[in-house]
Every structure is written in structure tokens, then in C-alpha cells.
Amino acid sequence: MEEYFNKTGYLFSGNAVFVEELYRQYLANPNSVDQTWQEFFADIKDNNVVLNKSTAKVISTNVTNKELLNNNLSSETLNNLKAKEMISAYRRNAHYLANLDPLGLEIRKTKNDLKLNIEAFGLDSSQLGENINIMDEFIGTWNCKLSELVTKLDKVYTSSIGVEFDQIENVEEKNWLYTKLETDITFTSEEKKSILNDLVEVECFEQFLHIKFPGAKRFSIEGGDASIVAMNKAIDLSMHQGVEEIVIGMAHRGRLNTLTKVVGKPYKEVIASFINGNIFPDGLNVSGDVKYHLGYSADRVRANQKIHLSLADNPSHLEAINSIVAGKVRAKQDIFVDTKRSKIKAILVHGDAAFCGQGVVAESLSMSPLTAYNVGGILHFVINNQLGFTANAADTRASRYSTEFAKIISAPILHVNGDDIEAVLKATDIAVEYRQKFSKDVVVEIICYRKYGHNEGDEPMYTQSKMYNIIKSKPTPGSIYANELVKNGIIDNNYYAKLKEKFKIRLDQEYEQAKSYKQETHFFEGYWKGISRIRGKDAITGVNKKILQDLGTKLCEIPKDFAINPKLIRLFEVRKTTLTTDQPIDWATAEQLAFAHLLCSGINIRLTGQDSARGTFSHRHSILHNQIDDTTYIPLNNLSKTQAKYEVANSNLSEYAALGFEYGYSLANPKNLVLWEAQFGDFANGAQIIFDQFISSSATKWLRMSGLVVLLPHAFEGQGPEHSSARLERFLQLAAEENMYITYPTTPASIFHLLRRQILESTRKPLIVMSPKSLLRHKYAVSKLDELGENTTFIPILDEVTKIDTNNVTKVILCSGKVYYDLFAMRTNNSNIVIIRLEQLYPFEKKLVASLLKKYNKAQAFIWCQEEPKNMGAWHYIATHLNDALKEAEINNEFKYVGREESASPAVGSLQVHNKQQEKLLMEALGDDIIKEKLY
């Protein structure tokens, strides 16, 4: 190849990328390139030379491109080649020249810095009048003077929009984007006036609140006004494209304007929350939340077209809402069978510091193209006000842009100056159309500023005096645009002031109405109609035994031409025999039967998690894989022609975003059973924000209910500190106001009833399950089919299973989970110790526990036994409840703790030490009634 470079100077340095691209084009279609290039490339092929920039030897030289050009090419062809290279270079790098900072603080690079001056391409000023004539499937069609080409490129790529499309691998997408960007967009005079009116309403509402409620936190959008107008534009464009619903997720910055101007919440309702502080009607007995965390839903109607808009409730934990919105959108798409994912879409609004600082952004983006999580692309707006509270951009990222994460999914990124509203709307137009056409994520970063501090009571001059001295005297985006319209003769000098005055009058009227406004509820509507906030009677969750046997048998029938793994053949044979001969069933079978009957009752089920399709412990096998080809078979989707859908999928290696997605999915329809399973319960704390800010508290903060099921494998089995504990204590600490169910079931019957209760009861509450590991195959951890049969239900507390004379009972042990089977196995046959299991820890059923304890009122000792260290597990939560139950049972005694000592780590790393600890707690719990021969 070096020989060819030596002979052909035009293949050096700056031309290399172009020539390589041209060569690929030639390989696809030789006639698509100039005759000269055809001859050259043919020669390369004949000599078996491979043109590949990853392997080609780089040759350095000090001579200029002009000196290297081969004289065999005509000057016109050479100029066209150079121009094509210049166009490509502008497309790749000119975003560094774009005027993106409305404050003018950025020191911009020059054309010389980026080698975008014409001399860098072997051209000079004497050639500016020469014609350029390019027809190329990658570059497009250009027929103009060189000077006009330079002017056009400067206008498109170095004005108020800078683009990064080079990370996109799909050539069609990339060419489409460049063509759209290089095509002028025009607004009529009326459209320009409408844009100005939008800016006025955004600006005036913020100023109105600032004057009426000085010092009140509202997290103003002033300085980033264009983002609200852009969202409005995106919604209108989407409506015209046939989108019927949009779910929006955003943080607190600009939220009040989004609620009113974008989503359609009455101004008086927002103002009333400032006046009286109420966000919900009296008497609901909920905690509520601050006004800039609240969501809202409404319909927007334009010219006989309607679109439903929802702004999701969210906490101050930035970017936490991302995957939740995606999950909610996916659920709605599934409800309406929007398989093209074109009718329902998501808009996410980010802050610059958060977008590049919060890891959940990368988690959520990575999920976006995956089959189980794809929503047809999300439109992202990044409001870059160049600060993160008090931190400068240089403190929060190393790159120029805050949007680098988006490149991991090859998303197009458009950076735009927030003071150029028409440029913002052009970028929005391109982004909306791209998402709808290609069904992929797209990012619009609006570079703007923040008029006040992080909130209106904060003083930014302490830390950003230079920036805020500029901001103090800076005209608003609305006034900048108004002056532009005056200059162009579209409005007169008084038009802008009149618009502001007119809108202020409206806000004054809204303010007066707000004084007497009574907050209304907009909850439990649509699919949630009929769902109760309060627990009703226990649902009967049992199913006719014959029906269960038939369903179980059907699940074991695999098509004859499907090459199933031989080990699974045996599993299904045993399972089928167990069912048909009415033998006790294991956990996996009970779960499958619960799913099967729900599916045949029209209930859709979605189960995701790391390795959930097979199951971490190889117990589920929801998806069977053909051993000959790549086909799969899902027994739960082959029960009946009229059944509902069972969707099971392995998630990406994420807890935070993955759990958030399923929580969001559960919000859309209470008639879906939605489950997320951790690989091990220990890893659930990677999603702690979802548990703390959403699952445990959304009902009392926002009146948003969820029936999500969370399966967390938990048990102390000598596997070390990261494979033992789902941190049960943390969930119990979150438990209050009957906000969720926390269970540690020990029988297949329990999980069967728990799963069915989630759908059959009148309310919806999250279900946290400390699910089994070794118990999946434990010989005693089985249930009779009668325990799942008609008129049966979930039993939160299980009494002693052996017959013991209550008058002879000396000790009562209460426990939860796997330790029960250890105690049961180690207890002597003639023991006077009873072992009682709490299958449900929260809500604590005090009356049931008390009535059971009363049976054993002659016992001298009452023990709570757990595997977890004393500072973990259920002890600190349950001790008071147990002693209260003793009082209610009129037993003058107290529960004593038996378990591991306090520890900073959940479990030891040594199996030998684990066994000694387990032996100690069993001996302490059982005393002389232990079978010593069975000790470790």
C-alpha cells in the first residue's frame, strides 16, 4: 500500500477518510464513482491491496495537499473532491465552531484550529468564484460557487446549532439528518408571533410567581425559556404525526411552567398551592409533596386532533424518573398493541450536570434498544444552564458537552443556543421527525443559563460572579426575539409589551380565583377506576384442583419436533407425574400454576430480571431453547388461544434502571401482573432510590399506586456477604401506613396465593418477597395441591405442623424463611417446642399472631429466631409488635432474640465459620431438644 500512496499524493492525510469512503462506495457499485477512481480502485484490487484505515500504514510528510495532488486529475474533479472532503469535515467537526453559549463565556475554536479553512483542503481564496458540482449519495447534491458553499456550511454548521452525528453507524440515518439540517426551515409571520407569545407566557408566569411569592422555591426556567417552547413544539409536531399520547419525565427546573404551559394544568391550581400549600383535598390523610415534584395529566386538542399528555411525578433524585417513564410508555404501547411504537412516546427533560453525572442515565440509555425495553426511541431535551447548583461545568465533566453518554447508543445529538429560538425549534423539528421515522433516541441540548441561583433563595454571586454579572444585564429570550421581529418589520415596538400586559391580566384573574380554589383529585381514573386505596377483605385466591392439574399438565407438554435439553425432559416428566398423582409440588410448579391460571383469566404477566427467564438457580425455565437451532418455546404462552400474554425477559446488568422500568410499567394498568427479580437479593440495593423514593412512598406522596412484585433471593447459606442478604431490615424500615407487603414465604402455597392476591384483591400495593434459594429444591419445602385449591387463601402466619399437646409446650419459636427448615430438621421428635412461621412480616397481623400465641400461653419461653445479624433482619422491627401481641394474648412474657450477633457485614466469607454460627443459633434456640448428631 505504501507504494500506492507514494504514487498518489491525493491519498495523503486529510483525504484519507474521503478516499476510504469512496472505495467502499466503489465496491458496492463501481459505476457510482468517477472513471478515474474506477481505474485506480481496479488497480488496487488487481494487486490485492486492501484499503483500510485500521491497517493501512500512516505516511507522514511535510508537503501540502496541493503539492501532492496528482496532475492526471482535472482541476474541476480535484476541486469537487476537495469540496466533498470539506463538507465531510464540516459535518464532523464544525460543531466546535458553533455559537452555542448565549452568555458568550466560551472561548471558541477557530477554523485554523480545526483545519476547516479552505487552505486545509488544498484550496485558496483565488478559487472562491469557481463552480462546485457534486452529486454523491453520501454528500448529497451541491451545485454552487465555492464561496457559496463555504457560506452555506458556515451558516448551517457554525451558527446556533452544532451537531454530532458521526457516532451513527447507519448511513441512511446519517444522510437523512445532514439533509434535514442543511435544509432551511422558515416560519411565517403568524408563526413567529405565536413563538413570541409562547416565550411571553413562559417569562411572565415565572415573573408573576417571583413577585407574588418572593423567596418561594419554584426552580424557575428563566434563561432556559426556549425549552418550554421546544416541548410545546415537539408535542404539536407529534400530534400531526399521529402520536396519541406522550409521557413526560423531568426534574424540578421549569416544572411549574411545564405543568401549565405544556401539559395544561390550570394556572389557578398551581397558584393555589402557593397560597394555601395544599396539593390534595382535605381528608385524604396523605403526606403529599412539594409542588415542583407533582405530575399531571390532560388532553390537548388542536384542530380536531387530540393528544393525551402526562407529566410523571418524581422526587428530587435527578434522572431517577428516566426508566420509569420508559416503562410506563412501554406498558401503554402494549395495552394499545402499538407494535410500531409510533402512537405513544416519551419525552425526557434532563439537566446538564445530571445527564453526565448520574449513572442511571447510562443504564437507561443502554436499555433503550433492547427488545424487552424498546419504546421506539425517546426524545431527550437537555437543559444546559452551564451550572450544577454551585458547580461550574468544568467541575462536573471533562468534555465540552454534557451529552457524551448518548453516544453509547449512537443517538444523534443537536446542540443549540437557547437564545436563538428559531434554531431551537429547527433542532426540535429534526429530532421529533427522526424519532418517528427511525424509532430511536435523539438528543437536543439547549445551552442556556439560569437567571437566579439553584433556587430563588440562593445567592449565585458567591461562586459565579462573572457569569451572573453578565446575566444581570442580559435581555430575556423573549425580548431578544421581540427585537428581532421588530427589526424584520413583523411587529411594532409596542407589540411585545402589550402581549406581556395581556397575559399579566389573565394571571391576575387566575390569582383571584386561586384564593377560593378547592383542590381536586385526578386519580384512580381510566384503568385505575374501581381500585381502592384501602385494603379490603382477603381475596380468595385458590383454584379448583382439577383445573390446576390440567394447567400443569399442559405446561409439561412440549412439541414433539422441539429438541429440548435432556435434563429438562426429566424435569417436566417428574413435574407432570407429581401433578397427575396429586403429590406435593415445589416452588417453581406453584409459581407456574399461579401464572397459568392468571393468564387464562385474561391477566397479562411481565417478568424481568437478570437471568429470570431460566432463573438464577435454574428452577423456572420459562423459555425453552431448542438444542439444534435458535428457536424457543414458552409453555406459558401455549395454554390457550384466548389466553393473555406472558412476557419474560432477561434484563441488562442493571438494578436501578431495570427496576425503575418495571415500576413504571406497573403504573399503567393495575390488571397486569408485573414482576422484577433480582439475581440475588443482595444486589437490590443498587436500586435503592427506586425503593425509597417510589415503591415505598408514591402512594402517600402522589396518590400513585403500584402492584409491582419484587422477588429477592435471600437466605444465609454460606455464600458470603454479597450472596446472603436482600437487606430485609431496610424494607421493614420503609414499611408504614400499609404502603406495601413484605413477605418471607416458606411454602409453594404461600407464593401461589401471594402472586394471585396481587391481582385479585381490591387494592394495589407493592409486594416484596424474600424468595428462596436452596428451598427451591428442599424436600420439605413443598405444598399439597389442596393448599392451592378452592376457597383457600394466603395465610400470613403458619402454626406448628406436628401434633403437640398445647399444655406441654415449654417454648415457642417464631421465625421467618429458611431458618424454619433448619430448626424443624434439628428438633427432636418428642420435643415440646413449637415453631411458628411468619410468612408476612408487614403488615403485621397482630390479632392473628395474638390468637395463635394464646394457644401456647403456658409456655415459659418465647423466642424470635433469625439467621441475620441482630442489627439486621426483622428483629428491630418486629420485637415491639411481638411483645404487643403477647400483651393482647394476656401472656406476661417477652420475646427473646436468638440469632447472629451484630455485624457490619451481612455474612461471613468462610463456609466453616458460617456453619459454626448456624450451629450456635440453632443450639441456642432449641436447647436440649436439638438432634446433636445432625449438627454441622
Curated annotation (Swiss-Prot):
It is an enzyme of class 1 (oxidoreductase). Homodimer. Part of the 2-oxoglutarate dehydrogenase (OGDH) complex composed of E1 (2-oxoglutarate dehydrogenase), E2 (dihydrolipoamide succinyltransferase) and E3 (dihydrolipoamide dehydrogenase); the complex contains multiple copies of the three enzymatic components (E1, E2 and E3). GO terms for molecular function: oxoglutarate dehydrogenase (succinyl-transferring) activity; thiamine pyrophosphate binding. One of its GO terms (cellular component) is oxoglutarate dehydrogenase complex. This is 2-oxoglutarate dehydrogenase E1 component. Belongs to the alpha-ketoglutarate dehydrogenase family. Its EC number is 1.2.4.2. Its cofactor is thiamine diphosphate. Keywords: Glycolysis, Oxidoreductase, Thiamine pyrophosphate. GO terms for biological process: glycolytic process; tricarboxylic acid cycle. It comes from Rickettsia prowazekii (strain Madrid E).
